[in-house]
C-alpha cells in the first residue's frame, strides 16, 4: 500500500464519517421536534418515568457517585413523587432548573452529566490568571501566565500517546475538546469576568449558554488575556473563542456535540537580559532600560480546531409508554348498549440490564490547524477520527455493569511544515481497547492503545496500562488506586525532523514505565506517588543539537495535597518531592510547595462571604531549561540555577450572591528585596510587586 493511498483513504474515511455525523445531528433536531410534548404529560399512576430496575449502589444524589443522576429526585411541582429519568417534563416549570447548570465533558467513550456550581471564590486567584498561577491554580505545574512561560516543575509521564510538533509555549493555555465545558440548562446562563492591575494587565471573559429546544443547548466563550511585559520589549496578547452545541435525546440514547475553538497568541520577545547583574544589583532602576538580547522580536501562533462527536445507545434507557384508543361496551338504562372510547396506556418496560447488550456506538471527528511564526514559519494540520463501541449502555442507571468493554480505532493524518520541509504521516488503523472488571466493590481496568505511523522516519507507538481501583465507601469519596503503565512513543515531530536534517540521526522511541499509587479522601487529602523509568529520552542542548540519552533514568515523584479547616481558618497546601537519577536528562527541583492560609467568613447574615489570607510559594534551585525565541524551544543547560526563592501574596476575596470580587497584592516581598534574584528562566526575571483585582458575575436570565 502506497503512502498516497493511505492518505487518500484517511480523507475518504473522514468525509464518510462527516456525512454520518451530519445525519446524526439532523436526526437530533428532528427527534427533538417529534418528542417535545404538546400538552401536559401525565405519568400513569404507579409507573415511574425513570427505570429503577436492578441492584447495587443506589446512591444517585451524590455528585461524586458514579451513579449520580441530577434528575433522580426532582419531583417538585410534578404529578407524582416517583423517581424521574432524563425525560423532559413540561409540567415541571423552569424553576426546577433555574440556578442549575449541568456541565458535560467531551469524552470519547461516555457523556456524563455533572452539576456545575455557580462561580465561587478561589483563594489562589486562578480565575483571574494571576501572576504566578497556572489556569488550575498551581503555578509550578503549568506555565504561569503573567510571567514568561517556563517548563513544568512536575513532569507527568506516560499519561497517554500524544502527537505534537514540539513542546509548546502555550501548552498551559490550550483549550481542547476534552477540557472545555458543554452546558445543559433551560434558563440562559451567562458568566462575565474582568481582571486588571496597576501594571495594565487585564483579562476579560464572556460565557453564555442558551437552550434552543428540549435537550439542545448552544454556548460560546470568549477570553482576552493581555499581560504587560515585565521589562523591555516583552508582553503578550491571547485571544480565545469557542462556540459549541450539544444535544441529548429525551431518553439520553442519542447524544451529540460539535464545536469550533480558535486561539490567537502573541508574545513580544527579547531573548532575556544581556547581563543578569544589572537587574540583581539594581544598576538600572528603570526596567525598560535594562539591556536585552533582542528588540522587537515576537512569537505568533494561530490555531483553529473543528470537532464533532455523536453516540447512540442501542439499548433503551427508560420505560416506553404507548397510548391507544380502546372501545368498551357497557349497559346503560333500559338495557341499551353504549360504546365508550377510552385511552389505554401500554407500558413497554426496559429489559433487565445485562453486561451482554447491544451497547453504544460512537463517532468522533476533528481537524486541528496550527500556524506559528517565530524566526521561521511552521504549521501543522491534523485530521483525526474515532470509531468505537462499548457495552456500557446504562450511564444513567444505578445498575453496575460487571464487565465493561470499549474498543475502536483512531485513524489520523498529519501534515507538518518545518523550516520549509514537509513531513506527512497517516494511519488507517490505530486500535484501542479498554476492559473494566468489577470485583466486589473494586474494579480492575486494562487499557491498550497503539498508533502506527506510516512514515519511515517514525516508529509505531504503543501504550498498555492496568489500574486497580478500590473505593472505601459507596459514594466513592475515599478511594485507593494502583496502576502500572508501559508506553513506547516516538519523540516530537520537530525533534525527528531536526535530527535527520541537521545531524543525519535516527531517533529511538522513548520508552517509559510508570508505577503509581494514589489515595484520595474527599477534597481533604490527595496523595500521589509515582516511580517513572525512562529510556532514550531526547532533548536539545544549548548548542541547539539533539541529544539522545544512552542510559536509562528513574524519576521518583510524590505529591501531597491537603485542605484543612478549623472553624473559619483554612490551610490549603500542595507539597511536591522529586528525585531524578540523571539531572542532565530530566532536570527537576527536589521540592516545590504552595500554601494558602486564609480565613473564610460569612458576614451580615450570610449575605457577604469573605476570604482574607496569604499565599506562599517556593521551589528549590535547579538547572531550569533555557528558552530560545528563534525556535520556540527549551534547551537543557547546567550553568544557571533557578529557584530557591519565596513568592508571597496577600489577597482578599468577596462574594455577594453571584458576584465575586478579587483583590491581591502579588509578590509583596519584592518591595524590600535589596538584591532581587527572582528569575523563572535563565535571564528572564519574574513579576515584581503588583496590585491585581477582578470581578466575576454569573446571571440566570
What does each of the following model-derived ranges do?
Residues 32-304, 314-327, 473-477, 684-688, ...:
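Membrane-proximal, glycine/serine-rich, low-complexity loop/turn segments characteristic
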Residues 1-40, 664, 689, 695-701:
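Bacterial Sec-dependent N-terminal signal peptides
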Residues 9-16, 20-22, 43, 50, ...:
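Intrinsically disordered, low-complexity, compositionally biased regions/tails
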Residues 8, 72-75, 95, 335, ...:
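Polar/charged alpha-helical tracts
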Residues 185, 296-701:
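Exposed, low-structure sequence patches enriched in small/polar residues
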Amino acid at each position: 500500500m502506497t503512502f498516497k493511498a493511505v492518505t487518500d483513504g484517511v480523507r475518504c474515511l473522514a468525509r464518510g464519517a462527516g456525512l454520518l455525523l451530519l445525519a446524526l445531528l439532523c436526526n437530533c433536531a428532528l427527534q427533538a421536534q417529534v418528542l417535545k410534548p404538546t400538552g401536559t404529560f401525565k405519568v400513569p399512576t404507579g409507573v415511574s418515568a425513570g427505570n429503577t430496575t436492578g441492584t447495587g449502589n443506589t446512591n444517585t444524589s451524590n455528585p461524586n457517585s458514579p451513579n449520580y443522576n441530577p434528575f433522580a429526585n426532582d419531583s417538585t411541582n410534578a404529578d407524582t413523587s416517583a423517581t424521574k429519568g432524563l425525560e423532559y417534563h413540561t409540567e415541571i416549570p423552569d424553576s426546577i432548573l433555574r440556578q442549575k447548570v449541568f456541565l458535560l465533558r467531551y469524552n470519547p467513550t461516555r457523556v456524563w452529566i455533572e452539576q456545575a456550581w455557580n462561580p465561587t471564590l478561589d483563594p489562589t486567584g486562578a480565575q483571574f490568571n494571576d501572576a504566578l498561577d497556572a489556569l488550575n491554580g498551581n503555578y509550578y505545574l503549568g506555565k504561569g501566565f503573567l510571567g514568561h512561560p517556563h517548563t513544568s516543575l512536575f513532569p507527568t509521564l506516560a499519561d497517554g500517546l500524544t502527537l505534537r510538533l514540539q513542546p509548546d509555549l502555550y501548552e498551559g493555555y490550550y483549550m481542547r475538546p476534552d477540557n472545555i465545558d458543554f452546558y445543559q440548562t433551560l434558563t440562559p446562563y451567562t458568566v462575565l469576568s474582568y481582571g486588571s492591575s496597576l501594571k495594565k494587565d487585564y483579562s476579560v471573559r464572556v460565557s453564555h449558554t442558551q437552550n434552543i429546544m428540549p435537550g439542545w443547548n448552544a454556548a460560546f466563550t470568549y477570553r482576552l488575556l493581555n499581560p504587560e511585559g515585565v521589562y523591555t520589549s516583552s508582553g503578550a496578547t491571547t485571544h480565545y473563542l469557542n462556540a459549541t452545541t450539544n444535544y441529548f435525546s429525551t431518553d439520553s440514547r442519542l447524544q451529540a456535540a460539535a464545536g469550533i475553538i480558535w486561539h490567537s497568541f502573541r508574545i513580544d520577545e527579547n531573548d532575556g537580559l544581556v547581563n543578569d547583574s544589572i537587574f540583581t544589583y539594581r544598576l538600572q532602576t528603570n526596567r525598560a532600560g535594562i539591556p536585552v538580547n533582542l528588540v522587537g522580536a515576537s512569537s505568533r501562533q494561530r490555531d483553529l480546531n473543528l470537532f464533532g462527536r455523536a453516540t447512540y445507545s442501542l439499548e433503551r434507557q427508560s420505560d416506553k409508554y404507548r397510548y391507544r384508543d380502546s372501545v368498551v361496551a357497557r349497559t346503560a338504562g333500559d338495557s341499551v348498549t353504549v360504546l365508550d372510547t377510552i385511552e389505554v396506556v401500554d407500558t413497554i418496560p426496559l429489559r433487565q440490564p445485562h453486561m451482554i447488550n447491544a451497547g453504544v456506538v460512537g463517532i468522533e471527528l476533528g481537524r486541528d490547524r496550527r500556524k506559528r511564526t517565530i524566526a521561521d514559519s511552521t504549521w501543522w494540520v491534523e485530521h483525526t477520527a474515532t470509531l468505537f463501541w462499548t457495552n456500557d449502555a446504562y450511564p444513567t442507571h444505578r445498575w453496575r455493569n460487571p464487565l465493561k468493554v470499549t474498543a475502536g480505532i483512531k485513524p489520523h493524518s498529519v501534515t507538518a511544515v518545518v523550516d520549509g520541509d514537509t513531513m506527512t504521516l497517516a494511519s488507517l488503523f490505530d486500535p484501542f481497547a479498554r476492559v473494566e472488571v468489577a470485583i466486589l466493590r473494586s474494579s480492575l481496568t486494562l487499557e491498550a492503545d497503539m498508533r502506527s505511523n506510516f512514515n519511515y522516519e517514525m516508529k509505531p507507538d504503543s501504550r498498555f496500562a492496568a489500574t486497580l481501583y478500590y473505593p472505601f465507601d459507596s459514594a466513592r469519596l475515599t478511594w485507593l488506586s494502583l496502576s502500572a503503565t508501559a508506553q513506547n512513543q516516538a519523540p516530537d515531530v520537530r525533534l525527528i525532523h531536526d535530527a535527520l536534517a541537521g545531524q543525519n540521526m535516527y531517533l529511538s522511541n522513548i520508552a517509559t514505565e510508570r508505577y503509581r499509587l494514589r489515595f484520595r479522601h474527599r477534597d481533604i487529602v490527595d496523595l500521589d506517588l509515582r516511580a517513572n523509568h525512562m529510556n532514550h529520552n531526547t532533548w536539545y542542548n544549548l548548542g541547539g543539537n539533539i541529544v539522545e540519552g544512552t542510559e536509562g533514568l528513574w524519576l521518583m515523584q510524590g505529591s501531597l495535597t491537603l485542605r484543612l479547616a478549623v472553624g473559619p481558618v483554612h490551610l490549603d497546601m500542595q507539597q511536591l518531592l522529586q528525585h531524578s537519577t540523571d539531572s542532565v536528562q530530566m532536570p527537576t527541583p527536589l521540592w516545590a510547595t504552595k500554601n494558602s492560609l486564609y480565613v473564610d467568613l460569612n458576614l451580615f447574615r450570610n449575605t457577604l462571604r469573605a476570604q482574607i489570607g496569604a499565599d506562599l510559594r517556593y521551589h528549590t534551585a535547579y538547572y531550569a531549561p533555557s528558552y530560545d525565541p528563534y525556535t520556540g524551544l527549551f534547551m537543557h543547560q547546567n550553568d544557571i540555577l533557578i529557584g530557591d526563592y519565596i513568592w508571597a501574596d496577600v489577597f482578599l476575596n468577596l462574594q455577594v450572591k453571584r458576584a465575586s470580587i478579587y483583590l491581591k497584592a502579588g509578590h509583596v516581598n519584592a518591595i524590600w528585596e535589596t538584591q532581587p534574584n527572582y528569575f523563572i528562566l535563565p535571564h528572564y526575571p519574574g513579576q515584581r510587586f503588583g496590585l491585581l483585582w477582578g470581578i466575576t458575575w454569573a446571571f440566570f436570565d
